[in-house]
Amino acid sequence: MHEPLPSLRLLNNGSTTFGLATGGTMEPLYAKICKTDIDFSNCISFNLDEYVGLEANHEQSYAYYMHQHLFHEKPFQASYLPNGLATNPLEEAARYEALLQQHSLDFQLLGIGQNGHIGFNEPGTSFESLTHLVTLEESTRQANARFFSSINEVPTQAFTMGIQSIMRAKCILLIAVGETKREVLERVLASDYTEEIPASALTKHPNVIILTDLQVEENKS
């Protein structure tokens, strides 16, 4: 698997806007970044998603995750996440999308779920979707239950950038690690372009980098 840090260094040559992701896949990357001299003090970040119902200092909120894994060592000029405690979630989703549209994402980090979700865009999400409120699939809640005391504590809803929101980024870095991601990555690379595999939207983006530890072949047909 190629090292993503050179890509970040090339981008990090001035005011840059990053879309950031969370989860176990990103932890080694953020740990490496924290040991470098990369400076984000002139940069802006937008997080891909956030749970509904968790305050920012909750240990499983993505605001807390970002502080623990990156922001405490590498602060940005400004860092934006959806407000998990917003009194009107639909208005909060619209507010966050409007904020995104005021900026242009230079670089978007993504992981991929076993069902092909990117962010919390579950199978069946429209490729035209903007930032929205989503009810999480049971498979996604099960996958994230390891971070909570029990699955009953895993939120049932989340905010997520929509697929169209993600696709506006100038460059996308998708990281897929481990055998559990093989099947879905092979389907994406086989150009199985369908809303039932949200990540397949990336095949239509002009500048996507895929980093993986898997030996997979791209279907050239």
Curated annotation (Swiss-Prot):
State what protein this is by name: Glucosamine-6-phosphate deaminase
Pfam families linked: Glucosamine_iso
Question: A biological process (GO) annotation for this entry?
Answer: N-acetylneuraminate catabolic process
Q: Work out whether the entry's keyword set contains Iron.
A: no
Gene3D superfamilies associated with the record: 3.40.50.1360
Organism superkingdom: Bacteria
Q: Which is a Gene Ontology cellular component entry for this protein?
A: cytoplasm
Which GO terms of the molecular function aspect are on file? glucosamine-6-phosphate deaminase activity; identical protein binding
Q: Into which family does the record put it? A: Belongs to the glucosamine/galactosamine-6-phosphate isomerase family. NagB subfamily.
- Gene name per UniProt: nagB
Key words of the record: Carbohydrate metabolism, Hydrolase
Organism of provenance: Lysinibacillus sphaericus (Bacillus sphaericus)
Reactions catalysed according to its record = alpha-D-glucosamine 6-phosphate + H2O = beta-D-fructose 6-phosphate + NH4(+)
Induction context: By N-acetylglucosamine.
Q: What class of enzyme is it?
A: hydrolase
User: Matching InterPro entries, A to Z?
Assistant: Glc/Gal-6P_isomerase, Glucosamine6P_isomerase, Glucosamine6P_isomerase_CS, NagB/RpiA_transferase-like
Disulfide-bond pairs as recorded: none
In short, the EC number is: 3.5.99.6
Q: Describe the task this protein carries out.
A: Catalyzes the reversible isomerization-deamination of glucosamine 6-phosphate (GlcN6P) to form fructose 6-phosphate (Fru6P) and ammonium ion.
User: Hydrolase among the record's keywords?
Assistant: yes
| UniProt-annotated catalytic positions | D49, N115, H117, E122
So, what pathway does this thing act in?
Answer: Amino-sugar metabolism; N-acetylneuraminate degradation; D-fructose 6-phosphate from N-acetylneuraminate: step 5/5
